[in-house]
């Protein structure tokens, strides 16, 4: 199992039990899933871009991505309903913990001009969303083989009831939040 999962079981649960005075260990918030999303709007005109994005996302997540399709037709973007315009991956279990560990120890330190993650990116229910402007911060991506630099949305879903609990959970994992 991933070291971060052991760290959660040994240290984070005890910290959260003391901080929020939960009656049971089962009340302690935990990370349930991580969703990675890559929107490729240019895929309408060039199908190879979507294939490139899918291979990059598969390398980052070690899982085959799902193609996302347009829900509505938008004439301004020349998109019809059902056109493939992106891809996403939902990570759970062992792969989720391994990705979270790589994100914290390798990928986030490689972000250019990084000043910390925003504390305002919580959704009101303890889930955290962040955007990465370049997929090349991940070591699995071969810099010479990329066709185009894509952005990446990362959604961390937790069982926390509030933003304060979610922030305390992610801060216990040593997420580099702004002061």
From Swiss-Prot:
- This protein's species is Hamiltonella defensa subsp. Acyrthosiphon pisum (strain 5AT)
Keyword vocabulary terms for this entry: Ribonucleoprotein, Ribosomal protein, RNA-binding, rRNA-binding, tRNA-binding
Q: How does it assemble?
A: Part of the 50S ribosomal subunit; part of the 5S rRNA/L5/L18/L25 subcomplex. Contacts the 5S rRNA and the P site tRNA. Forms a bridge to the 30S subunit in the 70S ribosome.
Q: Which GO terms describe its cellular component?
A: ribonucleoprotein complex; ribosome
Q: Any keyword Ribonucleoprotein?
A: yes
What domain of life does the native source organism fall in? Bacteria
Which Pfam families does the entry link to? Answer: Ribosomal_L5, Ribosomal_L5_C
* Taxon lineage: Bacteria, Pseudomonadati, Pseudomonadota, Gammaproteobacteria, Enterobacterales
Per the record, the gene is rplE
Q: Name one molecular function that GO assigns to this entry.
A: rRNA binding
> What's the protein called, per UniProt?
Large ribosomal subunit protein uL5
InterPro entries given in the database record: Ribosomal_uL5 (IPR002132), Ribosomal_uL5_bac-type (IPR020930), Ribosomal_uL5_C (IPR031309), Ribosomal_uL5_dom_sf (IPR022803), Ribosomal_uL5_N (IPR031310)
Q: Which residues form a coiled coil?
A: none
Provide a GO biological process annotation. translation
The record's function comment reads: This is one of the proteins that bind and probably mediate the attachment of the 5S RNA into the large ribosomal subunit, where it forms part of the central protuberance. In the 70S ribosome it contacts protein S13 of the 30S subunit (bridge B1b), connecting the 2 subunits; this bridge is implicated in subunit movement. Contacts the P site tRNA; the 5S rRNA and some of its associated proteins might help stabilize positioning of ribosome-bound tRNAs.
Q: Which HAMAP family match?
A: Ribosomal_uL5_B
Q: Which family does it belong to?
A: Belongs to the universal ribosomal protein uL5 family.
């Amino acid at each position: 199992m991933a070291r971060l999962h052991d760290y959660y079981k040994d240290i984070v649960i005890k910290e959260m039990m003391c901080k929020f005075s939960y009656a049971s260990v089962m009340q302690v918030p935990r990370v349930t899933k991580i969703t990675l999303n890559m929107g490729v709007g240019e895929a309408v005109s060039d199908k190879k871009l979507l294939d490139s994005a899918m291979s990059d996302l598969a390398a980052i997540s070690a899982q085959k991505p799902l193609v996302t399709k347009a829900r509505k037709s938008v004439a301004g973007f020349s998109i019809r309903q059902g056109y493939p315009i992106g891809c996403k991956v939902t990570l759970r279990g062992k792969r989720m913990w391994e990705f979270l560990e790589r994100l914290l120890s390798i990928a986030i330190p490689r972000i250019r001009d990084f000043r910390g993650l925003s504390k305002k990116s919580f959704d009101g229910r303890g889930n955290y969303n962040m955007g990465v402007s370049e997929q090349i911060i991940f070591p699995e991506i071969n810099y010479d083989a990329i066709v185009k630099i894509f952005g990446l949305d990362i959604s961390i879903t937790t069982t926390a009831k509030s933003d304060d609990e979610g922030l305390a959970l992610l801060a216990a994992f040593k997420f580099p939040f702004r002061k």
